Amino acid sequence: MDLPISLQDITYAENYLAQGDLATATPLLERLVELAEEYIDAECKTEENRQYFSFDSKFERLAYRRVEKDPRELVQVEVPFDRRYSDMAFAYIRQQDYVSARNALMQAVRWDPMNCNYRLDLAELFRALEDKQEWASLSFSVLERASDGRCAARAYANLGQYFLEPETENVSAAVGCARLALRLAPGDSHTTRLLSKIHATYPDAADESDEHVMGELALQGVPTSPSAEIAICLIMCATDAASDGDKQEATRLTVRARDLVGEEACAAIIKLVRESDAELNAERKAKRGAASGKADDAEEAGDAQ
């Protein structure tokens, strides 16, 4: 079955969405979803050894493999199905149809599970629908997937707000989340709101030591730093980009890694990746040398005969 939609079709509908023309954009997007789902049912069925995705980049694909440890063959589809569902969710949100928006964003996450903005927006929809546990769970899931400081900060800010809810109150954990969010994205509005709420409601919380509040987060199972695995993936992709001569992309990815885990940790990861690449290249060179030696020996034996 031929793919019935194209990137141009999605972009065409997005133009109406950007203009606020929901009356035109919504039926266009719904038709694209209908056509795409017919294609998905016929051509993209999940199998035991194969799954289909619409990752945005090579980095996301690598990060998914390392974080999820999914052994299946990962097949990249030709059209960004995730964008189509995200657009659909946005249209539903504008119409205050939060249940339909939630369902659409869940599909966006399914097609690009490494897009943390989808996860965070979906978390807010669950919160609007009064499912605070799922709001917190999705925010938590961002921490091991976030590839930039802003997304990680927003996830920490959400968890901080969760720890201020009456039924789950843990002020020390909330303070810990606020401090981590502040380090990652000091100007983020979610971070600012959390800090303001803590300051207004619990003014003495500022006196708690970092050791105490980070220890409380550890007890709650919340990591106190973004994922080193994600930073490694960023540096690996930066190294590949540099090898391909794309210095701009290499710099962009390296800066993301630095902003995520800090300059010292980033430098250590760069050193580790370079050493690993050097070892791998040495092994390949040795294998080629051994293979060449065997070929020469075989040729000499043939000449002797």
Set out the residue ranges of the language-model regions.
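TPR-repeat structural position
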Residues: 22, 98, 132, 169-171, ...
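Alpha-helical linker/edge segments of TPR/alpha-solenoid repeat scaffolds
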Residues: 53-72, 130-137, 164-173, 199-224, ...
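TPR alpha-solenoid repeat register
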Residues: 84, 118, 152-155, 191, ...
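Short coil turns that delineate tetratricopeptide repeat
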Residues: 37, 79, 113, 147-150, ...
